[in-house]
């Protein structure tokens, strides 16, 4: 016969020691006692082994902490008598894992040894006959829990409740000069208006609806001053630092370093959010990754492309002799000499690379202004000289127009000259602005030489080519 095991009383309980049933045969009782004692021995052995393992684990943790403490103490003893400045780096966070290990029971994973199959024993003795008298005697000895307390009656909702024990007469029970029992039904009796019945619910509603007296600020029309909210934010403050007048060098002081060198690389202060001076950042010279590609010919900037060709001339002018190639050469040479002279001039010191190496017409104009000395070094001229120069230029233009009128190339040359003068500010279409660096720059640019008269020896094939 197998022993009956007790039910688990706690959630997660692993072990359950069986108890021995009464009224068993002798052999059966002895077998169950032996099995229960053997089971109890296994359970106690497992419990003590787990406790010893947990104690060993805790002892190893305490030993590791002790080693850390001894190491820190040895470091402190080593630097205690030193007079050299030591910089200590401390982490802002405690060196511990971000998530702590949860506590686990020492009985996790334990198995109940009672679940194992045990050998079955065969008992030869027979059961004793049932005795009714003995059974009745056992029932008398066992305590039986019987509830003798009567169930509470529902409280009356209309009356005052149960009758008190100190009532001695009927007159003290009934309402004065009436036959109303207030403990059964609570009423307000008025001889003129009649009896008005009120229950406990109505009385509770009256008490709940009653308001308290108004505060003094409302009844006396007083005004409360608005309270200033307190600021609970942390505001760092260095405070008042006491001034100590001591000599600059204090030799042979115990526990004081003698090689302190205060510099700006000590790191942030104790109040990093306090306002402080911003250190000056170093300047970095940035360079362009890919320089601008400028079309150069023999180290000289190429002139801008020529204007579009004019419309075809009438047939009368088409039969004119062509322009010899020697006339175009001086023009190109003069432009190249002008560009080479401007490029060969010394560059301004400290100017950026894009300004020193211009890549367009505006850059060339700025470079010419810079070489001329700017507005501060420009020489101003009087209005009389400028008017005389303009009159001379107009006379020269009229002479050229009369001497070279009717020729295709001369007309084209005159148009180019007028265009250059209009751009430089000398033409009739330009505004009469004040003199300055622009006038000086425009004067420094030489005009194109006048075209030579065409020779009769050239053929028309050269003009067409």
Curated annotation (Swiss-Prot):
Ubiquitinated at Lys-220 via 'Lys-63'-linked ubiquitin chains by the TRIM27:MAGEL2 E3 ubiquitin ligase complex, leading to promote endosomal F-actin assembly. One of its GO terms (molecular function) is ubiquitin protein ligase binding. Signal peptide: none annotated. Residues 424-436 have a biased composition (Gly residues). Residues 1-167 are annotated as: WHD1. Keywords: Actin-binding, Cytoplasm, Cytoplasmic vesicle, Cytoskeleton, Endosome, Isopeptide bond, Membrane, Protein transport, Transport, Ubl conjugation. Residues 349-465 are annotated as: VCA. Residues 382-398 have a biased composition (Basic and acidic residues). There is a cross-link at residue 220 (Glycyl lysine isopeptide (Lys-Gly) (interchain with G-Cter in ubiquitin)). It is found in: Early endosome membrane; Recycling endosome membrane; Late endosome; Cytoplasmic vesicle, Autophagosome. One of its GO terms (cellular component) is early endosome. Residues 297-359, 376-407, 423-465 are annotated as: Disordered. Residues 1-54 are annotated as: Required for WASH complex assembly. Residues 302-314 have a biased composition (Pro residues). GO terms for biological process: Arp2/3 complex-mediated actin nucleation; endocytic recycling; endosomal transport; exocytosis; extracellular matrix disassembly; negative regulation of autophagy; positive regulation of cell migration; positive regulation of pseudopodium assembly. Residues 361-383 form the WH2 domain. Coiled coil: none annotated. InterPro entries: WASH1, WASH1_WAHD. Acts as a component of the WASH core complex that functions as a nucleation-promoting factor (NPF) at the surface of endosomes, where it recruits and activates the Arp2/3 complex to induce actin polymerization, playing a key role in the fission of tubules that serve as transport intermediates during endosome sorting. Involved in endocytic trafficking of EGF. Involved in transferrin receptor recycling. Regulates the trafficking of endosomal alpha5beta1 integrin to the plasma membrane and involved in invasive cell migration. Belongs to the WASH1 family. The VCA (verprolin, cofilin, acidic) domain promotes actin polymerization by the Arp2/3 complex in vitro. WASH genes duplicated to multiple chromosomal ends during primate evolution, with highest copy number reached in humans, whose WASH repertoires probably vary extensively among individuals. It is therefore difficult to determine which gene is functional or not. The telomeric region of chromosome 9p is paralogous to the pericentromeric regions of chromosome 9 as well as to 2q. Paralogous regions contain 7 transcriptional units. Duplicated WASH genes are also present in the Xq/Yq pseudoautosomal region, as well as on chromosome 1 and 15. The chromosome 16 copy seems to be a pseudogene. Component of the WASH core complex also described as WASH regulatory complex (SHRC) composed of WASH (WASHC1, WASH2P or WASH3P), WASHC2 (WASHC2A or WASHC2C), WASHC3, WASHC4 and WASHC5. The WASH core complex associates via WASHC2 with the F-actin-capping protein dimer (formed by CAPZA1, CAPZA2 or CAPZA3 and CAPZB) in a transient or substoichiometric manner which was initially described as WASH complex. Interacts (via WHD1 region) with WASHC2C; the interaction is direct. Interacts with VPS35; mediates the association with the retromer CSC complex. Interacts with FKBP15. This is WASH complex subunit 1.
